[in-house]
Amino acid sequence: MADTLSKLGISSPAIRKSAPGIDFKPFYTQHTDSVLQFMMLHSDNFFAEQLLLMAGREITGKLADRTTIDSLMKKDHKDLPDHPRWVDGSGLSRNNLISPHAFVALLNKMKKEFGWKRVSSILVNGGEGGTLKDYYSDYPENIFAKTGTLNGQATLSGYLITKKGRMLTFSFLVNNHQAPAGAVKSAVKNTLSKIIDHY
């Protein structure tokens, strides 16, 4: 809003105080995991942005995505390899730069800190629906992951359980491809299917 007003030649300092006698407090209506499940299943980028702001209020006391990201990168994610660059909550910006190595490290950290039961209940599995449904419906108990797609980019990161019971963490990031997105996703599926079936 301030940017829009500034373009119109209107400037005024922000007034940051409540009306007398009014104390604003958060009102929580949903459990975190149920919100995360919805966001992951439907790839809801708006939810992702709002959750980052809500996390910011808890972590820094501000509804500021940049401040929140900076705080998380300096504390919680300071040990991630390859120095990721993270700029938004939804992952839609091409300025986000994170390696498969960093994604795998983050996924392993999540599993260790939150436990497999919780993490697997939030991520979409191959038979559940969402963006995995068309490619992994024949592996409903073997793939727990999240896709990401932009023009010329296709990603899939998560966990797989092989038919021999091994759990592996993986991350595919295919950048600047010229092929149809479906062909890229099929190639990734072929690789993961071989790992599930034979390892």
Language-model regions, residue ranges each:
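A small/polar active-site loop signature that marks catalytic segments
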Residues: 1-117
